[in-house]
């Protein structure tokens, strides 16, 4: 079963900021490859919403590590959908970095 995904405003802003930072620092190929990886990871969530692990800070919130990239995707599994809350660099602490809903 494919689960619908909704990107929260902050997650979209995170994704855009990461893209533009990588574009300026490493070029369009790196920026595009990283964004494509985010999309492929979310596609995994569509098929398996529990693929990530619990964040420990809240019962419903989970995180999915992006392999070979220094990022995690923080999300919530709802009854009929998945909400992407944040896309964070692994050097940042998770607690307090996303909206609690």
For each feature predicted by the language model, list its residue ranges.
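Basic/aromatic recognition patch in beta-strand/loop cores that engages polyanionic ligands
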Residues: 39, 47-81
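Arg/Lys-rich, positively charged N-terminal/basic patches that mediate binding to nucleic acids
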Residues: 1-35
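Short amphipathic alpha-helical/adjacent loop interface patches that line ligand
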Residues: 15, 35-38, 42, 68
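Enriched for short, Lys/Arg-rich terminal
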Residues: 70-72, 76-101
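Catalytic cores of transferase enzymes with a strong primary signal for eukaryotic protein kinases
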Residues: 14-19, 51, 61, 91, ...
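Short, hydrophobic secondary-structure boundary micro-motifs
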Residues: 31, 53-55, 96
